[in-house]
């Protein structure tokens, strides 16, 4: 067993380059197609393993109670799946990825926790071998364990490595939140997108986010504001973060200066690999 006292891991954000809902499954989940890539926007998790047999989680922001926290749930799932008992660890989470944004911050933290536990207890285990465990924690957790830009199907756990041309991303986040349940029950959500080939290149004429219609129907004023800024803004996940991609950093910097509403914003690079 490795002798790790305090080890730091970065936990990256993702965006969905598109997100199509195909149909509803008998288990209540939805089949989808999406293309994930990562962002150089990241949290930092520090793991201090010890002999206390206690799990302590702290953060620079207010976080969910331990039993409701995805990091804690990841530890318990790891224990159950690999029969690793008596885990003692202090975890410090420095959050930079905004919550409720569609950037996968919580899922990323859970995946990073699985990787840290693997490194300490079961270093012979590959990332790919942990994907069946990761999906039990949430549909977005597998991509963060996988650690490479990928085309995803199923509920997000069937992954095919697919690089995306590196670009800059301008992220903007309004102070708006729609619950996942509200999205999926909305009459504005199309749940019958046509299956497309994973061999396609990025084609914004046929690749979109099916959840955008729901968001725009509920917040038409913000929708109009986005279109006035640039019609190519896309929503990631179920929002409420939107992004604009460009290889021209100066273009995005100029656009940032035009934003005259109180929106959180970031200018970051896309990444194909996070490990």
UniProtKB/Swiss-Prot annotation:
| Keyword Ligase applies | no
- Which sites are catalytic? 14, 140
Keyword Transcription regulation appears in the UniProt entry: no
The UniProt record lists the EC number as 2.7.1.148
Q: What processes in GO biological process is this protein linked to?
A: isopentenyl diphosphate biosynthetic process, methylerythritol 4-phosphate pathway; terpenoid biosynthetic process
Q: Which Pfam families match?
A: GHMP_kinases_C, GHMP_kinases_N
Q: Which UniProt keywords apply?
A: ATP-binding, Isoprene biosynthesis, Kinase, Nucleotide-binding, Transferase
Provide the residue positions that the database annotates as binding ATP. Answer: 98-108
Instruction: Give the pathway annotation.
Output: Isoprenoid biosynthesis; isopentenyl diphosphate biosynthesis via DXP pathway; isopentenyl diphosphate from 1-deoxy-D-xylulose 5-phosphate: step 3/6
Q: Name one GO molecular function term.
A: 4-(cytidine 5'-diphospho)-2-C-methyl-D-erythritol kinase activity
Check the record and name the InterPro entries matching this protein: GHMP_kinase_C_dom (IPR013750), GHMP_kinase_C_sf (IPR036554), GHMP_kinase_N_dom (IPR006204), IspE (IPR004424), Ribosomal_Su5_D2-typ_SF (IPR020568), Ribsml_uS5_D2-typ_fold_subgr (IPR014721)
Return the broad EC class.
Answer: transferase
Q: Which reaction does it catalyse?
A: 4-CDP-2-C-methyl-D-erythritol + ATP = 4-CDP-2-C-methyl-D-erythritol 2-phosphate + ADP + H(+)
Q: What does it do?
A: Catalyzes the phosphorylation of the position 2 hydroxy group of 4-diphosphocytidyl-2C-methyl-D-erythritol.
Q: Which family does it belong to?
A: Belongs to the GHMP kinase family. IspE subfamily.
Name of the protein described by the UniProt record: 4-diphosphocytidyl-2-C-methyl-D-erythritol kinase
Q: Provide the species name.
A: Francisella tularensis subsp. holarctica (strain LVS)
Lineage start: Bacteria, Pseudomonadati, Pseudomonadota, Gammaproteobacteria, Thiotrichales
Q: Which gene holds the coding sequence for this protein? A: ispE
